[in-house]
Amino acid sequence: MMSIKKYFGTNVKFKPTIVIALISSFIFILDQLTKFFVVHILDLSGRLSITVISGFINFNMAWNEGINFGLFANSSEIMRIFLIIISILICMGIFFWAIKQNSILLLLFSSLIIGGALGNVVDRIIYGAVADFLNITCCGIYNPYSFNIADISIFFGVVGLIFSPNSKNQN
């Protein structure tokens, strides 16, 4: 059991496994709901592009068979299965590391990574690729890449773990 007294001034006790399960589940469900809405309700897979805020936010359908920025795309079925297994193993490693930490921040950041990674794993299982659809362009600079809620969650989780004051003392 951990306490959040140093963060919120209250001595509420909680189990790290429950915190990770709740936050990861929230991210996972949010990711899957947004993908379902965009792919199936808005039919982005058929329309390919929808302008949300002109010159800033677009929904551009991209099926990412690889990893970040499409690396290893167009690989074999074995590579897809390998990526699924590696993602699950990394999630398990992060989970078992995080539950040993005495920091709500490290639990939060770890949960963001786990929830996002599992969202992308489900895409690989269901669709054979990750459904990316968010595209942000700014100031006249064209951005060819699309991403999703899971990617955002993973990004902030990794950045949070790297820059968390609690992680500086960790190996």
Where are the language model's segments positioned?
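Alpha-helical transmembrane bundles and membrane-interface segments of multipass inner-membrane proteins
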Residues: 1-171
